[in-house]
């Protein structure tokens, strides 16, 4: 493919500063784009406003710069794009692919769960709202068909949306648009061709591919890098109190991220500046070297 046509992205949620797990995802997407001579964009996924932390977006951008991860173009901010998501929802409504749902969480507490612990919607409102109810959210009808996906790290996968996911929400009861819709709209808007992100989002990908088909937008290639866990096996996150990226010793932290991705830098680069490490890594990037299994973050000595 024409290298100039390769566009990757890093799309953090500003719920706090970046940690090692988010650095690994950022580095992987950066290297994948740069190795192809392409562009690397940044998007702030602040769609879930109640979870966002004031000032976190600025902190994240400064962390990226400090670690040598320089992006192209302007940063796209999801909270400024409700008009685009509303237009996409209108398209789904016009096709009959989306329908209003009046169900509350309390009403769905007994619904079955899938292997990811997500609720499998029982279809209560699929054929129309029950009497004396009002719409609270909007769902997309999940087809009883397998959505196929080739992941550049995990290989060929498939998921039956109706049986494994169920009709899923695209606009929430609190009026916020759901991640599944927003990410599809924004990837298309930014011309993203290569999505490289954490393996916790692999399960969501067939839903996004289905929405791409309904909305008539291209499907990018996907690669899901391993999750970084603590010694208890929990994904590094704000909820598990993952420490923020250190301001000192960035070379060692970046080298740790590269080792995690199966690209250990040579000994002569010990202590090298982040920009030098990333230059080396972009010329040696081979996505087939990235492991498929979660990696335990070793505590700092």
Curated annotation (Swiss-Prot):
Residue ranges the record marks as coiled coil: none
Which residues are noted in the entry as L-glutamate-binding? 9-13, 45, 179, 197
Membrane-spanning residues: none
- Job description of the protein: Catalyzes the tRNA-independent activation of glutamate in presence of ATP and the subsequent transfer of glutamate onto a tRNA(Asp). Glutamate is transferred on the 2-amino-5-(4,5-dihydroxy-2-cyclopenten-1-yl) moiety of the queuosine in the wobble position of the QUC anticodon.
Pfam family for this entry, one? tRNA-synt_1c
Look up the EC number in the record and give it.
Answer: 6.1.1.-
Source organism of this protein record: Thiobacillus denitrificans (strain ATCC 25259 / T1)
UniProt: ATP binding residues: 238
What Gene3D superfamilies does the annotation carry? HUPs
GO annotations of cellular component type: cytosol
Report keywords, A-Z: Aminoacyl-tRNA synthetase, ATP-binding, Ligase, Metal-binding, Nucleotide-binding, Zinc
Record's family? Answer: Belongs to the class-I aminoacyl-tRNA synthetase family. GluQ subfamily.
Q: Kindly state what the record says about how the cofactor is bound.
A: Binds 1 zinc ion per subunit.
What is the protein's name according to its record? Glutamyl-Q tRNA(Asp) synthetase
Any one GO BP annotation for this protein: glutamyl-tRNA aminoacylation
**Record-linked InterPro entries:** Glu-Q_tRNA(Asp)_Synthase, Glu/Gln-tRNA-synth, Glu/Gln-tRNA-synth_Ib_cat-dom, GluQ/Sye, Rossmann-like_a/b/a_fold
Write down the top EC class of this protein. Answer: ligase
Q: Name one GO molecular function term.
A: zinc ion binding
Where is motif 'HIGH' region found?
A: 12-22
Co-factor(s): Zn(2+)
Q: Where in this protein would one find the motif 'KMSKS' region, according to its record?
A: 235-239
List of residues binding Zn(2+): 101, 103, 121, 125
């Amino acid at each position: 493919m024409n290298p100039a046509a390769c566009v990757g992205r890093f799309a953090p949620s500003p719920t706090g500063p970046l940690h090692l797990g988010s650095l690994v995802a950022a580095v992987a997407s950066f290297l994948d784009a740069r190795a192809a001579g392409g562009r690397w964009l940044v998007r702030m996924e602040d769609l879930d406003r109640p979870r966002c932390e004031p000032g976190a977006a600025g902190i994240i951008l400064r962390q990226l710069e400090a670690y040598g991860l320089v992006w192209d173009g302007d940063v796209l901010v999801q909270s400024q794009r409700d008009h685009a998501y509303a237009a996409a929802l209108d398209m789904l409504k016009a096709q009959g692919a989306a329908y209003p749902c009046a169900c509350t969480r309390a009403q769905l507490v007994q619904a079955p769960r899938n292997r990811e612990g997500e609720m499998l919607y029982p279809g209560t409102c699929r054929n129309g709202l029950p009497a004396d109810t009002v719409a609270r959210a909007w769902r997309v009808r999940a087809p009883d068909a397998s959505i196929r996906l080739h992941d550049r790290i995990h290989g060929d996968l498939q998921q039956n949306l109706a049986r494994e996911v169920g009709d899923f929400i695209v606009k929430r009861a609190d009026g916020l648009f759901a991640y599944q819709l927003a990410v599809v709209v924004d990837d298309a808007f930014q011309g993203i061709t290569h999505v490289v992100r954490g393996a916790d989002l692999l399960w969501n990908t067939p839903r996004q591919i289905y929405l791409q088909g309904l909305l008539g937008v291209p499907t990018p290639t996907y690669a899901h890098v391993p999750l970084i866990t603590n010694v208890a096996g929990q994904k590094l996150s704000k909820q598990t109190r993952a420490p923020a990226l250190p301001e000192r010793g960035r070379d060692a932290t970046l080298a740790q991220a590269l080792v995690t991705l199966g690209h250990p830098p040579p000994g002569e680069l010990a202590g090298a500046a982040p920009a030098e490490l990333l230059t080396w890594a972009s010329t040696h990037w081979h996505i087939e070297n990235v492991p498929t299994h979660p990696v335990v973050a070793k505590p700092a000595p």
